[in-house]
Swiss-Prot record:
InterPro entries: Ribosomal_bS20, Ribosomal_bS20_sf. It comes from Rhizobium etli (strain ATCC 51251 / DSM 11541 / JCM 21823 / NBRC 15573 / CFN 42). This is Small ribosomal subunit protein bS20. GO terms for cellular component: cytosol; small ribosomal subunit. GO terms for molecular function: small ribosomal subunit rRNA binding; structural constituent of ribosome.
């Protein structure tokens, strides 16, 4: 339990930041899930649109420190590869 005034304030700040970060992380997961669902459905246009919406969310989470920058880059890269593979015609 925090005893000093500054420690109590720090605890309050941590709780606020935790809520903000939790919401941001949830938002990122939602956008990534939308891309994955579009890929699973096989709709290339929908997948590309969802990917273009998810990309800045991942970058924002990385810049705010919610995700490590390498993690965000890895997620973007893997999603981009899957979207690209979906848009390439399988008969070519």
């Amino acid at each position: 339990m925090a005893n000093t005034t500054s420690a109590k304030k720090a605890t309050r700040k941590i709780a606020r930041r935790t809520d903000v970060n939790k919401a941001r992380r949830s938002r990122v997961r939602t956008f990534v899930r939308q891309v994955e669902e579009a890929i699973a459905s096989g709709d290339a246009d929908k997948a590309k649109a969802a990917f273009l919406a998810a990309q800045p969310e991942l970058a924002r989470a990385a810049s705010k420190g919610v995700l490590h920058s390498n993690t965000a880059s890895r997620k973007v890269s893997r999603l981009a590869a899957r979207v690209k593979a979906l848009s390439v015609s399988p008969t070519a």
